[in-house]
Amino acid sequence: MAASNPPKGSVSSSSIRPVTRKAVRCQREVAWLVTQAAGRLVASTEDVNAPTPSFVLAAALDSVRQLELAEQDASGHLDYQNVMAPDLQTFCHMAKLPAAPNALSDAGYMFTLSGADLIRDIYAYCSELAERHVFNAAEIKPGYAIKLVLRLFLMDGFGTMPA
């Protein structure tokens, strides 16, 4: 008996590959935050190669998750609203970062997430934030979560995290 071939145009489970690149719309501020976070990563390791934005975000997300666990263990919580509330110039002062260029605006920036794991982790983090009602929103957009993760990472790195 001959093996049956699937109909032309059908998709088999072996032909489905995970998405490995995803463009996410963010504020232009995110581009600047990534450069600051990359500088912090390079300064804290002996690797002199410039990390990719996706690598920086993955490291920042890992750091933020550890920070959240530590806060839970201490029966505390992170003050997400105070991390996101200030404008960029005020945030830079709070996080002890150099002043951001004045040319930065709320104009768009496309952040390309690379890697199926990072894409899945960012979307899972969005869901977690929404489930915990962190911002009293039914849905947290990936661009907002990326900005939050980078801000938390940069504030924690200099011991300036609001309680």
Predicted regions and their residues:
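Short Lys/Arg-rich basic patches
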Residues: A2-L41, M84-C126
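Serine/threonine-rich low-complexity intrinsically disordered regions
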Residues: S12, T20, Q27-E29, S44-D47, ...
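Short, basic amphipathic alpha-helical segments that act as recognition/interaction helices
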Residues: S44-L78, V134-A163
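Mixed-charge, glycine-accented linear interaction segment located at domain edges/termini
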Residues: I122-C126, A130, K147, R151
